[in-house]
From Swiss-Prot:
THUMP domain: residues covered: 44-155
HAMAP family per the UniProt record, alphabetical: 23SrRNA_methyltr_KL (MF_01858)
Family of this protein: Belongs to the methyltransferase superfamily. RlmKL family.
NCBIfam families: PRK11783.1 (NF008748)
Name this polypeptide is given: Ribosomal RNA large subunit methyltransferase K/L
InterPro entries tied to this protein: 23SrRNA_methyltr_KL, DNA_methylase_N6_adenine_CS, RlmKL-like_Mtase, RlmKL-like_Mtase_CS, RlmL_1st, SAM-dep_methyl-trfase, SAM-dependent_MTases_sf, THUMP_dom
Organism: Legionella pneumophila (strain Corby)
Compartmental location: Cytoplasm
Length: 707
């Protein structure tokens, strides 16, 4: 008797899975992006459960039928002969996927299927199975699409990637079946048969090395667990199952060479050894604590296979370029005659290897699309893109410009007690970056390239930028941070891109300020407003200073150091806490200053306080959910300025600033107030190349201007 099956897999593995399943005896009827459909006898089903290295779940298709409505789903599930699958004393759980016009909630769909099963057994013998959502003996899958319900029984009960040997993993674990796919794409079974060695220099918890050992030693991955759901299946033949398990055990063979995993993290190596012991391959493998640059081959020929870090947070990719360059250098220098297979999601990092790939395969590490680069390490595969490689003509022009800017701006910065400044701002259009110096760090903000620029050209420019900046500016490669600067919209204002809590203290005149170069697109300090901040550093003691949309209140720090009494208003609690930290860093008594978490527009409407100096620097646009209304600075600047002017003492001054490049001040404001465009006076030396970085206006009441 043959059974209809659906075997699911990770995205991108369906055709590799098809080949594997055919080799195990499945008659394939259809391949889809979600997996493979086929027919198989009971012995073949058991072998699939024991031997598949790529599958996620093996589902026995029970029935399908038209079911647009709740009643139809219930009827199909009530009518099916469930006693042919399991008995009433088993525990069950339902996983429901899909929807119809009437069934839009998967929990509701699962409830209908469960009710149908329960009603069937009650009619049959008056008893019913119990529900156990955590660890059911019988897991039923129901899928509703285009008003067709398909119901299946999960023969194993869990995803087959859960081999049972990995109790703990590192920070970025690789699924066992994705690791197996990497090895199959790299032709590891064939290489192992020829006596090749294997080395994973980023082994983490050992998944790749363990999977490679199981393949080479012909160990069936399904042997490691004995809690498969098929033992509760009504048609299970335990004698046949045990016979096939015994045959699988008899096929295990010894290895001629040990497979090696190394990692710079000693703690993770201990975990890898424990995992290998649980997998039963500890005698076949060797795990050592070793940095990448110390890795050396133990055999003349072999396969280097690895899943290095590839940084999905903004800024991390660039941090990893030196690591990939070192990997390329180590492979080229020490592993001649070997093969290599390297998984990464970043084309920039792949190019940083400096080695030519023979083949590329798309794989998915979870939801993340990656490429597996397969290489032959030979003299013919010459190393490129090394840190000291000769510069192209364009890259040399960039080097010259950066060196010129550095020589000019470093002297100016030292003279003015400034440790953070802009050194480059797309001076050469083909290298569309802004580069800011923060102490001995460089933050590279890449302007999003136009769609007309081919991807390969943009990637080439990125690599050249990373090659040139450390040389020209004397910055260590590990202290380069890259972000992509694009037009910010709505909730993207001050976009958070990660969490490292890595803070750096910089100096600006008499003030010390905290910046975070990693976790946000912006660093906590708008460098272009430096001259405005230094202007506030000259306020008279006792001046009442309002900083609206205060961000991290760096302007207020300067004012407070001069003796001003500051009020700081912002909607973000995160930035207000950061502002308080800035004050503490400068030994400023917080009791003399206010930090108010408010929508600035609403606060200015209700406050009765008066101020001598107001700094109003709103975002160009914001639609934060916590705001009462959308903020559009071109549309709303008149009302904001009017509200701020109401809060001024008779002789007070409002400084209004915006970074909206195309900003136009409403002419009627000049009729109502004395308005002076002071933008040129607020552009410091490092922003002279980009005089439209912001607009700044000094606004006072007309009678005060006459005085």
């Amino acid at each position: 008797m043959n059974y209809s099956l659906f075997i699911s897999c990770s995205k991108g593995l369906e055709y590799l899975l098809e080949d594997e399943l055919k080799g195990l005896g499945l008659h394939v009827t259809q391949v889809s992006p979600q997996g493979v459909y086929g027919e198989a006898s009971l012995p073949v089903i058991y072998n699939l459960c024991l031997w598949s290295r790529l599958a996620n779940r093996i589902q026995l298709i029970l029935f399908s039928g038209h079911a647009a409505k709740e009643q139809a789903v219930h009827q199909l599930c009530t009518d099916f002969h469930w006693q042919t699958v399991f008995t009433h004393d088993k525990t069950i759980a339902i996983e429901f996927h899909g929807a119809s016009e009437q069934i839009r909630n998967t929990m509701f769909g699962a409830q209908i299927v469960k009710d149908g099963i329960v009603d069937h057994f009650r009619r049959l013998n008056g008893s019913r199975p119990s529900v156990d959502k955590e660890k059911p003996q019988i897991l039923i899958h129901a899928h509703l699409k285009n008003d067709i319900l398909t119901v299946s029984f999960d023969l194993v009960g869990y995803s087959l990637h859960q081999r049972g040997y990995r109790k703990k993993a590192g920070k970025a674990p690789l699924k066992e079946n994705v690791a197996a796919a990497m090895l199959l794409r790299a032709k590891w079974p064939e290489l192992a048969a020829q006596g090749y060695g294997l080395h994973d220099p980023f082994c983490g918890s050992g998944t790749l090395v363990i999977e490679a050992a199981m393949m080479a030693a012909h160990i069936a991955p399904g042997l490691l667990r004995q809690d498969q759901s098929l033992q509760y299946w009504a048609r299970h033949q335990s004698s046949l199952w045990e016979k096939l398990r015994t045959q699988a055990l008899q096929q295990v063979k010894p290895l001629a060479v040990k497979l090696v995993g190394t990692d710079a993290d000693g703690k993770i190596i201990t975990l890898a050894r424990s995992n290998a012991e649980r997998a039963g391959v500890l005698p076949l493998v060797e795990f050592n604590t070793l940095p990448l640059n110390a890795c050396r081959p133990g055999t003349k020929k072999g396969l280097v296979v690895c899943n290095p870090p590839y940084g999905e947070r903004l800024g991390e990719v660039t941090q990893l370029v030196p690591l990939y360059q070192q990997l390329g250098t180590t492979l080229h220098t020490c592993y001649q005659g070997w093969q290599a297979a390297i998984l990464t999601s970043s084309p920039v990092l792949a190019k940083a290897l400096g080695l030519r790939a023979d083949k590329q395969y798309t794989l998915y590490n979870g939801p993340l699309e990656c490429k597996l680069y397969c290489l032959t390490l030979s003299a013919a595969n010459k190393l490129k893109n090394t840190p000291n490689a000769p510069l192209s003509d364009n890259a040399q022009m960039l080097f010259n410009r950066l060196e010129k800017n550095r020589n000019h701006l470093q002297k100016w910065a030292r003279k003015n007690q400034i440790t953070c400044y802009r050194i480059y701002d797309a001076d050469l259009p083909e290298y569309a970056y802004a580069i800011d110096i923060y102490n001995d760090y460089a933050v590279l903000q890449e302007y999003a390239p136009p769609a007309s620029i081919p991807v390969h050209k943009a990637e080439k420019r990125s690599l050249e930028m990373l090659q040139v900046v450390p040389r020209a500016l004397g910055i260590h490669p590990e202290k380069l941070i890259v972000k992509q600067r694009k037009q910010q919209k709505g909730s993207e204002q001050y976009q958070k891109i990660g969490k490292t809590s890595q803070r750096l203290i910089v100096t600006e005149g008499k003030a010390k300020l905290i910046v975070n170069l990693y976790d946000y697109l912006d660093t906590g300090l708008f460098l272009d407003h430096r001259l405005m901040r230094l202007k506030f550093a000259q306020l008279e003691p006792g001046t009442r200073f309002l900083n609206c949309f205060c961000y991290t209140a760096s302007a207020s720090v300067h004012a407070a150091l001069a003796g001003a009494l500051t009020t700081n208003v912002d909607l973000s609690k995160t930035y207000l806490l950061w502002a308080e930290d800035n004050f503490r860093l400068n030994d400023i008594d917080l009791s003399k200053h206010q930090f108010l978490q408010y929508d600035c527009k609403e606060w200015m409407k209700i406050t009765r306080d008066k101020f001598d100096v107001i700094f109003l620097d709103p975002p160009s646009f914001s639609n934060s959910k916590r705001m009462s209304d959308i903020l559009d600075i071109q549309r709303d600047h008149v009302s904001l300025i009017n509200m701020a002017m109401r809060l001024l003492n008779p002789n007070g001054v409002l400084y209004f600033s915006t970074n909206l490049r195309q900003f136009k001040l409403e002419p009627m404001l000049k009729e109502k107030y004395a308005v002076q465009d002071i933008t040129p006076q607020t552009i410091d030396q490092d922003f002279k190349r980009n005089s439209k970085i912001h607009h700044c206006f000094k606004i006072v009441m007309p009678h005060f201007a006459d005085n």
